[in-house]
């Protein structure tokens, strides 16, 4: 651990002599007020909400897929394989993201990836065999993997270069809020109606974010 930490410091030491790529602008209105004004701009809140929805769904799936598998008597091996498929296809999607971005706009990619993810979440609730669930998760992992980095791109496109650090911070704060709230709601749904209901709830969350994509 110590060796890896020291290795990680090597590029940081080299960066200390580099000049900032964007010159900082003096903030005369205060950080909080500046953040509020930034979020009020057209498209920013919608972009943050899309990011919240996609990141929350990706995290909640990791927790509730094993529970759903247990409820349907999947073997531990099958559950582990399904989780590996989700992670693997998400990673795989990043390899194709550059080519997809060259062919399609950010709006088109976000629109279709969110629709596909929504349909996959609905389908998961009715997948009662490991093979069926694994196939659905394969598609969902890819579509969620496409959507996550695009929300960062969307926030960047909506702001000036001098404001991007604050905009990205606002996006991250939205993600953390979603990662706090959505699992709590998902737990309540699972306790009342089973893990399948969680997937329906996630589909509803993604469906509401589709309208935010269109507004952008």
Across the structure, where does each feature detected by a protein language model lie?
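Pair of pore-lining "gating" transmembrane helices in MFS-fold secondary transporters
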Residues: 40-57, 138
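Loop-to-transmembrane helix entry/capping segments in MFS-fold secondary transporters
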Residues: 76-77, 161-171
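C-terminal membrane-cytosol helix-exit motif in multi-pass small-molecule transporters
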Residues: 2-23, 209-216
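A membrane-interface helix-boundary motif in multi-pass transporters
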Residues: 1-2, 188-206
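Helix-to-loop junctions at the C-terminal end of transmembrane segments
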Residues: 93-105, 190
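Intracellular juxtamembrane helix-capping segments at the cytosolic ends
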Residues: 146-159
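Juxtamembrane intracellular "pre-TM" segments in multi-pass secondary transporters
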Residues: 15-48
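Structural signature of the two symmetry-related core transmembrane helices
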Residues: 108-123
């Amino acid at each position: 651990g110590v060796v890896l930490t020291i290795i990680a410091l090597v590029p940081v030491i080299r960066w200390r002599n580099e000049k900032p790529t964007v010159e900082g602008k003096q903030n005369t209105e205060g950080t909080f007020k500046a953040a509020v004004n930034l979020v009020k701009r057209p498209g920013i809140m919608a972009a943050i909400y899309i990011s919240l929805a996609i990141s929350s769904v990706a995290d909640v799936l990791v927790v509730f897929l094993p529970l759903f598998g247990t409820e349907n008597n999947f073997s531990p091996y099958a559950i582990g394989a399904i989780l590996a498929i989700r992670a693997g296809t998400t990673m795989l999607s990043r390899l194709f993201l550059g080519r997809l971005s060259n062919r399609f706009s950010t709006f088109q990619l976000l629109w279709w990836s969110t629709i596909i993810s929504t349909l996959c979440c609905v389908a998961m609730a009715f997948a009662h065999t490991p093979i069926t669930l694994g196939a659905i998760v394969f598609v969902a992992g890819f579509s969620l993997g496409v959507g996550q980095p695009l929300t960062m791109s969307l926030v960047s496109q909506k702001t000036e270069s001098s404001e991007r650090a604050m905009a990205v911070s606002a996006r991250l704060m939205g993600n953390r809020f979603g990662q706090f709230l959505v699992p709590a709601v998902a737990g309540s749904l699972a306790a009342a109606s089973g893990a399948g209901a969680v997937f329906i709830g996630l589909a509803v969350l993604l469906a509401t974010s589709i309208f935010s994509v269109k507004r952008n």
